[in-house]
Swiss-Prot record:
NCBIfam families listed in its UniProt record: B4_12hDH
One Pfam family per UniProt: ADH_N_2
Family: Belongs to the NADP-dependent oxidoreductase L4BD family.
This protein's UniProt keywords: Acetylation, Cytoplasm, Fatty acid metabolism, Hydroxylation, Lipid metabolism, NADP, Oxidoreductase, Phosphoprotein, Prostaglandin metabolism
Species assigned in the record: Oryctolagus cuniculus (Rabbit)
GO annotation terms (biological process): leukotriene B4 metabolic process; lipoxin A4 metabolic process; prostaglandin metabolic process
Function of the protein: NAD(P)H-dependent oxidoreductase involved in metabolic inactivation of pro- and anti-inflammatory eicosanoids: prostaglandins (PG), leukotrienes (LT) and lipoxins (LX). Catalyzes with high efficiency the reduction of the 13,14 double bond of 15-oxoPGs, including 15-oxo-PGE1, 15-oxo-PGE2, 15-oxo-PGF1-alpha and 15-oxo-PGF2-alpha. Catalyzes with lower efficiency the oxidation of the hydroxyl group at C12 of LTB4 and its derivatives, converting them into biologically less active 12-oxo-LTB4 metabolites.
Modification sites for Phosphoserine: S20
Protein name, as recorded: Prostaglandin reductase 1
């Protein structure tokens, strides 16, 4: 019998999640049936969507999420022992799968690259950035692109893809450390939205002629201000609204209908799983190539230990992460934190 540890939703969040909202449970997994595999988590992801998605869970359910896992026992010939996979097993140290929802890592994945990037730059956040910018926004050479939460897992990739495509890129972030990071990875203009005297004036200074594309991860009043500075026929990709996820009061009104109407702005929300299958795999391969060529740089916000999953989640929602936030489940994993110069380690104290 394998004893699995699961982080469960003890009670639904009210405002900012707290430790008391989670419960760590240990369960004994049954023997495998034919066609099933036993997975051992190596790296687990925490993402903003989990804050909203948790509303669909029942209290007592395992928290949702993606992980890089290793097959440690198999009764499915398609998934032999030792296979490394992407699994939607949630916050679980071990899980059983019938193989239907598993994905293999790209065959081109080099030994020199951390496997955890399959949860970040060369994974769901990368796909979100890739298609949100290139398909939803339709960014092209010469465009001025604005992205907020720009030092996060999605935003940092958005900005770097935009630079690859010949755009001028403006990024907003919530600390001076993050602003410095954005400048380091090639943003043309970056600012700390928490310290500027006037968001409106800062946006005008960054792009006096306005913005062609706006990749929105934040929502709220920030976005209302941006909409008023969009160019004619501007495009807005609505990826998230993290500024409002923990709100318990009345939400701010949306953007001015007058601005949207007379500037003929196109706004579209989207979710990454629209691009599954071959089209998604092609994008992942291109992202991997850009990483290996040094055209896309990355950082990871790493918290060690499965027991610290709630802490990783809460710190990500508070904006403490630079780059992709994830947890290292097992110290016996194939890539230890610190093995790669782009890792940022934030131990729990």
């Amino acid at each position: 019998m394998v004893r699995a540890k699961n982080w469960t939703l003890k009670k639904h969040f009210h405002g900012h999640p707290t430790d008391s909202d989670f419960e760590l449970k240990t369960v004994e997994l049954p023997p495998l049936n034919n066609g099933e595999v036993l997975l051992e988590a190596l790296f687990l992801s925490v993402d903003p969507y989990m804050r909203l998605g948790s509303k669909r869970l029942k209290e007592g359910d395992t928290m949702m999420g993606q992980q890089v896992a290793r097959v440690v026992e198999s009764k499915n010939p398609a998934w032999p022992v030792g296979t490394l996979v992407l699994a939607h097993s949630g916050w679980a140290s071990h899980s059983i799968s019938d193989g239907q929802q598993l994905e293999k890592l790209l065959t081109e994945w080099p030994d020199t690259l951390p496997l955890s990037l399959a949860l970040g730059t060369v994974g769901m956040p990368g796909i979100t950035a890739y298609f949100g910018l290139l398909e939803i926004c339709g960014a092209k050479s010469g465009d001025t692109v604005l992205v907020n939460a720009a030092a996060g897992a999605v935003g940092a990739v958005v900005g770097q893809i935009a630079k690859i495509k010949g755009c001028r890129v403006v990024g907003a972030a919530g600390s001076e450390e993050k602003v410095d990071y954005l400048k380091k990875i090639g943003f043309d203009f970056a600012f700390n939205y928490k310290t500027v005297k006037s968001l409106e004036e800062t946006l005008k200074k960054a792009a006096p002629d306005g913005y062609d594309c706006y990749f929105d991860n934040v929502g709220g009043e920030f976005s209302n201000t941006v909409i008023r500075q969009m160019k004619k026929f501007g495009r807005v990709a609505i990826c998230g609204a993290i500024s409002m996820y923990n709100s318990t009061g009345q939400l701010p009104p949306g953007p001015s209908p007058e601005s949207v109407l007379y500037q003929e702005i196109r706004m579209e929300g989207f979710i990454f799983n629209r691009w599954k299958g071959e089209v998604g795999q092609k994008a992942l391969k291109e992202l991997l190539t850009w990483v290996l060529e040094g055209k896309i740089q990355y950082r990871e916000f790493v918290i060690e230990g499965f027991e610290n999953m709630p802490a990783a989640f809460m710190r990500m929602l508070k904006g403490e992460n630079v780059g992709k936030a994830r947890s290292e489940s097992l110290k016996s994993g194939t890539c230890k934190p610190g093995d790669h110069p782009h890792d940022l380690i934030f131990p729990i104290t």
